[in-house]
Amino acid sequence: MNTPEWVKKENIKITLDARPLLAQGIHPLEQVQQECAALQPGEIFEIITPFPPAPMIEKMAAAGFETYSESGGDGMFHTFFSNIQ
């Protein structure tokens, strides 16, 4: 799958490395929802996880956000959410 046109590194406003939270048993969904709600049109929120966060992607897509996830060269998954309206 090709990277969508809206995923531009210069538009990433926030990057959250969720690995420390997940290691503590904390699910970052609420934080992601709060951060994404504050995004301006075109801004991107990136979350880094050791697995594809499928339920989170589904919830954010259902809330009207554009979503895209890719496996990085570091073995981590980089998932992007944007309010592109």
Feature locations, PLM:
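A generic structural signal for beta-strand entry/edge sites
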Residues: K13, I44, D74-M76
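C-terminal edge-of-domain segments
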Residues: G64-Q85
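Generic marker of residues within folded, mature protein domains
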Residues: W6, I57, S69-S71
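Amphipathic, hydrophobic secondary-structure cores in small proteins
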Residues: E30-E35, L39-E66
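An N-terminal amphipathic alpha-helical segment
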Residues: M1-A38
